[in-house]
């Protein structure tokens, strides 16, 4: 299949990136697979094109740019703050559309003014789209994983359940299934008798050895799946979580929170009212939320065009705070999306914590909207 043609508006994109004082970065198409498998989430994991080197190293075709850009930043020991831009192909298995397509975007690393940096990426994404799609009305949906994490923590759930719920944030079907299993827990079934016995003993090392042996005997490749250690730990976690029940009151509060939605000018009041009714201490998360709203307003953003959704997230595990998407008003086709990922660079090997936020533009979708203007 031929590669997708470079979009005709690529020059305008590069002009926008230069005007925003970004450094354009190129990253290899072939990437080490492990960072994506570990940190990008199940949704992207299923879409990755996998391969391996002659030495057996797991590799993949570049499925997105954020992780490669961060890895390059770490490898080159570049100081911060630093703003990177990119324009290139990504490769994902998709039900609709080509599996190879262009993305462009900006990654903003190291700015310690979190609210200002968050506001800037939303403004940059919408401003670039307004140039590429003149006369089109845009709508922004904004969520906040930090607020969701604060609600889950304030409810006093075990850390294992907090982690699972946070990982499912943004996927309502998965969240609903998890909440149902919390309210009506079911014992683990269908386990190999030997695995069940080893789980009962709590001997992780022996369980890992057994799983490794079984995987080798059956030819089950760890290049396309989890390692024996990962599987063992997930099984142990599932066993512990299966014994946990969420009180009805906490379940109702979570459902109420996830149903919250409001135009951004009213969102702070809506969240504050919820916290007061639920008697949950969310001060830190709500303060950060309020600062971001103020930064957007101070930058001249029409807050009425932005909708806050408490359940809104994006299907990538590395987000930690702001998440957002931009669509043409009246459409559900995402033209730009991004968010904050403050833990990612440390997980990838950075020696110090580097706050980070960014966004990607879906160029094939932008091209389709531009094409719809033509007679």
UniProtKB/Swiss-Prot annotation:
GO biological process, one term: histidyl-tRNA aminoacylation
Main localisation: cytoplasm
SUPFAM superfamilies linked: Class II aaRS and biotin synthetases
The keyword rRNA-binding is annotated on this UniProt entry: no
Entry's transmembrane regions: none
Xref: InterPro entries: aa-tRNA-synth_II/BPL/LPL, HisRS-like_core, HisRS/HisZ, HisZ
UniProt superkingdom: Bacteria
UniProt keyword terms in alphabetical order: Amino-acid biosynthesis, Cytoplasm, Histidine biosynthesis
Pathway(s) where this gene product acts: Amino-acid biosynthesis; L-histidine biosynthesis; L-histidine from 5-phospho-alpha-D-ribose 1-diphosphate: step 1/9
One cellular-component annotation, GO: cytoplasm
Keyword Isomerase: no
Subcellular locations according to the entry: Cytoplasm
A Pfam family the protein falls into: tRNA-synt_His
GO molecular function: histidine-tRNA ligase activity
Additional remarks: This function is generally fulfilled by the C-terminal part of HisG, which is missing in some bacteria such as this one.
PANTHER family: HISTIDINE--TRNA LIGASE, MITOCHONDRIAL-RELATED (PTHR43707:SF1), HISTIDYL-TRNA SYNTHETASE (PTHR43707)
Functional note: Required for the first step of histidine biosynthesis. May allow the feedback regulation of ATP phosphoribosyltransferase activity by histidine.
Binding partners and assembly: Heteromultimer composed of HisG and HisZ subunits.
Annotated family: Belongs to the class-II aminoacyl-tRNA synthetase family. HisZ subfamily.
Name this protein carries in UniProt: ATP phosphoribosyltransferase regulatory subunit
The species this protein was found in: Agrobacterium fabrum (strain C58 / ATCC 33970) (Agrobacterium tumefaciens (strain C58))
Taxon lineage: Bacteria, Pseudomonadati, Pseudomonadota, Alphaproteobacteria, Hyphomicrobiales
């Amino acid at each position: 299949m031929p590669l997708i043609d470079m979009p005709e508006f690529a020059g305008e994109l590069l002009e926008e990136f230069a005007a925003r004082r970004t450094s354009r970065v190129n990253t290899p198409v072939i990437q080490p697979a492990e960072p994506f498998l570990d940190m990008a989430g199940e949704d992207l994991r299923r879409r990755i094109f996998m391969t391996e080197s002659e030495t057996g190293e797991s590799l993949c075709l570049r499925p997105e740019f954020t992780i490669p850009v961060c890895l390059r930043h770490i490898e080159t020991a570049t100081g911060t703050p630093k703003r990177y831009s990119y324009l290139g192909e990504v490769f994902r298995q998709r039900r609709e559309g080509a599996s190879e397509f262009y993305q462009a975007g900006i990654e903003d690393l190291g700015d310690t003014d979190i609210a200002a940096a968050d506001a800037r990426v939303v403004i940059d994404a919408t401003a670039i789209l307004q140039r590429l799609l003149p006369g089109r009305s845009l709508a922004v949906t904004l969520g906040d994983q930090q607020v969701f994490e604060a609600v889950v923590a304030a409810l006093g759930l075990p850390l294992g359940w907090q982690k699972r719920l946070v990982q499912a944030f943004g996927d309502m079907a998965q969240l609903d299934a998890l909440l149902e299993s919390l309210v009506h827990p079911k014992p683990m079934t269908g386990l190999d008798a030997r695995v069940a016995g080893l789980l009962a003993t709590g001997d992780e090392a022996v369980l890992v050895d057994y799983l490794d042996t079984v995987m080798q005997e059956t030819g089950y490749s760890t290049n396309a799946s989890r390692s024996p250690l990962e599987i063992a730990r997930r099984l142990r976690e599932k066993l512990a979580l299966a014994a946990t029940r969420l009180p009805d009151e906490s379940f109702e509060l979570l459902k109420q929170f996830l149903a919250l939605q409001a135009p951004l000018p009213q969102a702070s009041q809506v969240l504050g009212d919820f916290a007061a009714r639920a008697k949950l201490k969310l001060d830190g998360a709500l303060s950060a939320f309020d600062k971001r709203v103020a930064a957007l307003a101070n930058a001249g953003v029409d807050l009425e065009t932005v909708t806050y959704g408490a359940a809104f997230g994006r299907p990538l595990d590395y987000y930690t705070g702001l998440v957002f998407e931009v669509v043409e008003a009246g459409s559900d086709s995402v033209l730009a999306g991004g968010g904050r990922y403050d833990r990612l660079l440390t997980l990838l090997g950075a020696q110090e914590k580097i706050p980070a936020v960014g966004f990607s533009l879906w160029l094939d979708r932008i091209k389709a909207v531009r094409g719809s203007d033509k007679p």
